[in-house]
């Protein structure tokens, strides 16, 4: 048995409800046609091969001998129905895949898109497209019928998810007999749960708590693809409408120091995108560099000058901006 601490549960376990499906893949209950490896490569899951036949046609060969958690065989027709159900229930998902039609051809699924969509495979790895038995939706909000190595046996919103090994899993016998997943959203409480051995593993070790786990623990660092960014309000009412102000801000930020403080050494000081996960980062020219003198020069040329309060001002109005961040994550 293993106890796991996650930093977030969805409101439900319905794969089509908002972003709730992410919990299903994290706990080993749900699977998609393909998935992504830690080094960002596509690998087969419920489809064992695929082909982009032409700009608007994709062919997926559906893995044989797969069963849903209720014992029903997973057929290409079942996969078709699952994808179509997801598109019907989730406008966000339908918009991402741009699917015009899905047809069954033997063990293959033929997907036609409304336009060339090179990112279709990537979109189908999104947890919203976990394959489920849509003929068995009576408990979809708490016990969706999926295909993963672990079967959901109970769900208590905001508390726990209980799972049991699925004996008929296509990938062989799961490594654990059972798993308890706990919803521990507070970073400090999650860290304390691991320290006290209330859980065996936690997701998302807050940077401020990394030092607690130097001895006797194994922290795995992986290059992420999530980008936390500040978006500028370009409307005329905002001082950021002025390109000079935006440029000055880009030059005044000390990226390395900010990364060291916020990421506690685990986050690279880079902008505008993380170098570890974005193709083409190294080719970006004129990356913003910390240069306070340059920022001062830019603002001066734009008509700003320091007033008696030491604040930059223009036409008698001090330069001031308001920053709003997502307040749920205290690590930010």
Give, region by region, the residue ranges found by the protein language model:
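Gly/Pro-rich hinge or "lid" segments in bacterial periplasmic/extracellular proteins
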Residues: 41, 124-174, 178, 188, ...
């Amino acid at each position: 048995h293993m106890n796991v601490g996650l930093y977030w549960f969805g409101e439900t376990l319905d794969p089509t409800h908002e972003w709730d499906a992410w919990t299903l893949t994290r706990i080993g209950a749900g699977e998609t046609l393909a998935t992504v490896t830690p080094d960002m490569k596509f690998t087969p899951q419920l489809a064992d091969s695929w082909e982009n036949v032409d700009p608007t046609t994709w062919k997926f060969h559906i893995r044989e001998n797969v069963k849903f958690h209720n014992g029903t065989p997973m057929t290409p027709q079942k996969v078709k129905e699952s994808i179509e159900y997801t598109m019907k229930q989730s406008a966000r998902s339908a918009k991402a895949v741009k699917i015009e039609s899905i047809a069954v051809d033997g063990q293959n699924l033929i997907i036609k898109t409304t336009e060339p969509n090179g990112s279709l495979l990537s979109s189908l790895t999104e947890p919203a497209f976990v394959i489920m038995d849509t003929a068995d939706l009576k408990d979809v909000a708490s016990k969706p019928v999926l295909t993963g190595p672990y079967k959901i046996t109970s769900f208590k919103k905001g508390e726990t998810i209980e799972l049991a090994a699925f004996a008929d899993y296509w990938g062989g016998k799961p490594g654990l007999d059972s798993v308890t997943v706990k919803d521990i959203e507070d970073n400090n409480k999650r860290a304390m749960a691991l320290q006290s051995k209330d859980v065996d593993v936690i997701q998302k070790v807050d940077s401020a708590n990394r030092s607690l786990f130097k001895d006797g623990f194994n922290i795995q660092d992986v290059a992420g693809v999530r980008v936390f960014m500040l978006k500028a309000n370009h409307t005329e009412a905002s001082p950021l409408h002025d390109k000079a102000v935006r440029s000055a801000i880009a030059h005044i930020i000390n990226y390395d120091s900010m990364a060291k403080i916020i990421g506690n050494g685990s986050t690279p000081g880079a902008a505008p995108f993380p170098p570890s996960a974005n193709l083409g980062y190294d080719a970006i020219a004129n990356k913003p560099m910390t240069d306070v003198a340059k920022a001062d020069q830019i603002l001066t040329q734009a008509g700003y000058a320091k007033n008696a309060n030491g604040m930059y001002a223009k036409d008698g109005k001090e330069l001031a901006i308001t920053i709003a961040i997502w307040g749920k994550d205290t690590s930010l």
